[in-house]
């Protein structure tokens, strides 16, 4: 009886696996960032743009934590698609952001992708 149960559990675990859909993260603290390997090729230009533009004002750690927890680390407000859009508009209006509408749109799409992947 025990052998049958053990065999059944082994087969079940062998056939069924849990897929981790979350975006991988590298580093800790101020060096924390999304792993470029876990980002689809179509999103890589937006990711590269985010790596250059967003770190002018804050570390990527802030963005990673917001995506992982669903909470903006500074304000404590929900970090969802609506908030991402609002942050995009806010960044567009900042005089030193050096970002245009297309760049903001690309980064908003990327952040929404991260939110979707993290929710899986």
What are these language model-derived features?
Residues 51-61, 107-111:
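The canonical Cys-X-X-Cys-His
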Residues 4-13:
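Sec-dependent N-terminal signal peptides
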Residues 15-21:
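Sec/Tat signal peptide C-region and signal peptidase I cleavage site
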Residues 40, 44, 48, 78, ...:
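Soluble non-cytosolic domains of exported or imported proteins
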